[in-house]
A protein has these predicted regions:
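Non-catalytic interaction surface on structured domains
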Residues: 24-31, 46-58
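Internal, conserved structured core segments that host functional sites
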Residues: 92-109
Length: 224
């Protein structure tokens, strides 16, 4: 549900061909490519999948003032979508699904010089909110303005992922998982279980919008 390739993410070393190859080795049913820049058409995705049976979907990871948001099924990028309010308004009118990506990365145990973008601006003393999912859900209204919360991110600590899952539970929000892979090494380290069998980016977006997803941590042992 969350991976980057060399086609649209300058910080990625993962080619689309290698992505498809590794995903098939892992018996994944599908992969959603969420580039930092640019997007894929369904026709381009089908060409890359090249008859392997792997379903490929397109989205975009957008950095907003409150954190990173995955916009699944984004038909085009427009100026101003880096503002969270503009992004939610655009999504509402265009059938786009929004997923808060790794919302609490660097929150529970931040590395030196880094902080969680989502919680850094809270006026409440950080110790009171450190691991309190109910307080965080109440203090951050943006978490209830997306369709799902990423609760199993392969590039985020277990503690931060667990806090995301707990907060989603408080909000009654559905969850997703994604590797956030920028190389072949991380593919499959965060997964999403989806009700039904979406085959296009629009169908995947609709599944997320109606809450038909669930985060699954770890690589798969078999197709699911």
């Amino acid at each position: 549900m969350h991976v980057h390739t060399t086609r649209g993410s300058t910080d990625s070393g993962l080619s689309p061909a290698d992505l498809v190859s590794v995903a098939n080795e892992l018996n994944l049913d599908g992969v959603c490519i969420t580039e930092h820049g640019g997007s894929w058409s369904d026709a381009e995705l089908q060409e890359v999948a090249d008859g392997t049976g792997l379903a490929l979907f397109s989205g975009r990871e957008i950095e907003t003032e409150v954190g990173h948001v995955l916009a699944i099924g984004l038909p085009r990028y427009e100026a101003g979508l880096h503002r969270f309010s503009a992004l939610t308004e655009f999504a509402s009118g265009n059938g786009v699904a929004l997923v808060f990506a790794h919302p609490f990365r660097h929150h529970t145990d931040p590395p030196a010089g880094q902080s969680c973008l989502l919680t850094a601006g809270l006026s409440e003393p950080v110790p009171e909110l450190r691991m309190n999912a109910e307080a965080l859900a109440k203090a951050i209204p943006e978490l209830s303005q997306v369709h799902a919360i990423e609760a199993a991110n392969g590039a985020t600590s277990q503690a931060d992922n667990e806090l995301a899952a707990a907060t989603a539970s408080v909000l009654g929000a559905s969850t997703t998982g994604g590797s956030d892979a920028h190389s072949a090494h991380g593919i499959g380290s965060g997964l999403t279980r989806i009700e039904g069998r979406p085959r296009t980016s629009a169908e995947l977006a609709e599944a997320i919008r109606v809450g038909a997803t669930e985060a699954v941590a770890g690589r798969p042992d078999e197709k699911s």
